Amino acid sequence: MKTRPAFSTLMVLTALAVASPPGAAQQFTRRAPIATVSAPVILDTAGLYLERAARVGEDMFVTGQPTERALRELKAQGVTTVVNLRTPEEMTRNVPFDEAALVASLGMQYVYLPVRGNDQFPYSPATLTKFADAVGNAKGKVLLHCTVAWRASHLWAAYLINRGIPVDSALANARAINLMDDHRMGSNGRQPVEDFLDKALPTLGHPPR
């Protein structure tokens, strides 16, 4: 019998997690811990993604904006859920096709979680919970994307930390994709990963303010 990578176990454990109680929208659900996560494999982006793309294990893709071709290829590779972190303005201004409609036409689940680090689209524990739920409910592989995989890397790191991966290991995994300690802060002068978790990470670099 073929042994599935660690991330497959991660998805099963997420599916078994207890749902958040009513009124807990601003709290993330604590799920069963996982022991390890595969190192990201950087993918060729030519004609497929904007800027950056990586596969983590066999079941997770963390990327920049995918093209129509990329979405069709991901469907063929077993992706069943697409999670988009870009805002409506970004999608309207910069994407020459209707992503939601294409994803639906391909028979995949579309999960829209726009984040930008402002009052309208904050980095929040609620987004982390919804992403974890999307992973847990996925019937196949998952694509998590934003514009250049920066926001997606922060959410991915928060997800790993919430699942029990040590902070330094989770940050290293996400940095290998496109997490950067730069000036684009979330609320309270924190990095997005910290706002997704609603806690400070002392080992995370913070640029001078």
Question: What are these regions, as identified by a protein language model?
Answer:
Residues 8-19:
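Bacterial N-terminal signal peptides
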Residues 23-142, 156-209:
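Cys-dependent protein tyrosine phosphatase-like superfamily
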Residues 146:
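Short cysteine clusters
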